[in-house]
Amino acid sequence: MKFTPPPASLRNPLIIPEKIMMGPGPSNCSKRVLTAMTNTVLSNFHAELFRTMDEVKDGLRYIFQTENRATMCVSGSAHAGMEAMLSNLLEEGDRVLIAVNGIWAERAVEMSERYGADVRTIEGPPDRPFSLETLARAIELHQPKCLFLTHGDSSSGLLQPLEGVGQICHQHDCLLIVDAVASLCGVPFYMDKWEIDAVYTGAQKVLGAPPGITPISISPKALDVIRNRRTKSKVFYWDLLLLGNYWGCYDEPKRYHHTVASNLIFALREALAQIAEEGLENQIKRRIECAQILYEGLGKMGLDIFVKDPRHRLPTVTGIMIPKGVDWWKVSQYAMNNFSLEVQGGLGPTFGKAWRVGIMGECSTVQKIQFYLYGFKESLKATHPDYIFEESNGFH
C-alpha cells in the first residue's frame, strides 16, 4: 500500500497559549469545567451518561426558570439552537414576525426564508429596544404564527425587555421565540412567568462552558405545535421530537438519535453546578456590579458606550464606541500581543464603530474588569500616543 506522507505540521506538539477571553464569547471556562472534559468518553446508552443528562436538564430548568419537560440540548453552537427552533416551529408558508435591530435577528430572517416561511419584519435602531406597544401593533397587523425576539444582542450590547410580550403573543395565538444566547444568567429571565414558548442560549457565553452544545427549552404549547405539524421537520438532526425522546423528555422508551458529545455534556453539567452553588441571584448581581465598574472606568478614559440609555444596556456585553482617528484593530492586536487580552471589534451594526467587551464565564470578577481596563488603556496609549483621556459626560 502507498499513501501520501503525513503532514509535517502534525509532528509538532500542540501548544495553545492562555488568553483572557473578554470578548462577547466564547468565555474562559473554570478549571473545574475543563477538568470535567477529561472524563472517559461514554457511549450513547451508558447509564452514567443518561444520569448526567438528567442533571443537566435539572440545571437548565433552573437557569431558564421553567418547569418545561421539553428542556434539553442540541449538538452545535448557539446557531444550532436558532435553527432547531425555527425548523421545528415553522412550516412552508407559515408567517413569522422577526424584530430586527441586530445581526442575530437578521440571521433568523435568513434561516426562516430558507424554510419557506412568510417572513415579516419590524426594524429598529441597534441601540434601542422595541417597545411593548410597537410589538403589539406589529402582532395585530401581521397575525404571525411566531414572534422572534433577541433578548440580549451581543453585536451591540442591547437588552430587550420581555415582560408582557408573551401575554400579547398568546392573545393573538402567536408563539414567542427568544434568543437568550448572551443574556441568560447575566440578567433576570423567567421563561414560564413571561410566557415564553421557545428559548435557546449559548453554553460558551455567560454559562462558562465550552462551545458545541446548546441548551434549549420549549413550552407545552410549542410542543403541541411541533407534534401537529403537517409535515415532518425538514432537518432530521434538529427534530425536537426525536431529540427530546433521546433526552428523556416525553415519558417514552429512549431511542438512538445521534451520538452526543458526552464530554461537552460533562462540562456543561459542571458549569450549571457552579451556577447552582452560587445561586442565580448572586450570579446576576455580580455581573451587573462588574458592568457598572466597567462603565465607570471607560468613562474616565473619555469613551462612550454604544447603547446610551443605561436601562437598555446588556451587562454581559458592552459596546465601546471607537473614538475618531483611532484604529480599533491596532488596539486589539496590541492588547492580545502584550496582555493576552481579547479586545474584540464590532459585528453587524457595530462593525468598525465599536469594540465589544464581555462579562461572561470566569471573566465576571472585579479583578478581571480592572485588568481589562488597565490593558485596554495601555493598548490605546501605546498605539495612539496623541489620544487624550478626558472623562466622558454621557456615561452614567
UniProtKB/Swiss-Prot annotation:
Keyword Plastid belongs to the record: no
Chief location of this protein? other
Q: Which GO terms describe its cellular component?
A: peroxisome
Q: Name one GO biological process term.
A: glycine biosynthetic process, by transamination of glyoxylate
CDD domains to which the protein is assigned, alphabetical: AGAT_like (cd06451)
Where does the record place it? Answer: Peroxisome
Reaction catalysed by this enzyme: L-kynurenine + glyoxylate = kynurenate + glycine + H2O; 3-hydroxy-L-kynurenine + glyoxylate = xanthurenate + glycine + H2O; 3-hydroxy-L-kynurenine + pyruvate = xanthurenate + L-alanine + H2O; glyoxylate + L-alanine = glycine + pyruvate
Q: What is its EC number?
A: 2.6.1.63, 2.6.1.44
Description of pH dependence: Optimum pH is 7.8.
Name the top EC class.
transferase
Q: Which UniProt keywords apply?
A: Aminotransferase, Peroxisome, Pyridoxal phosphate, Transferase
In this record, what's one Pfam family? Answer: Aminotran_5
Query: Which of this chain's residues are annotated to bind pyridoxal 5'-phosphate?
Result: 77-79, 154, 204, 256, 259
**Region of interest (Binds to and confers specificity for 3-hydroxykynurenine), ranges:** 43-44
Cofactor(s) recorded for this entry are: pyridoxal 5'-phosphate
- Hey, what tissues is this thing expressed in? Expressed in gut and ovaries.
| Family classification | Belongs to the class-V pyridoxal-phosphate-dependent aminotransferase family.
**Name recorded for this polypeptide:** 3-hydroxykynurenine transaminase
Species for this entry? Anopheles gambiae
Q: Which gene encodes it?
A: HKT
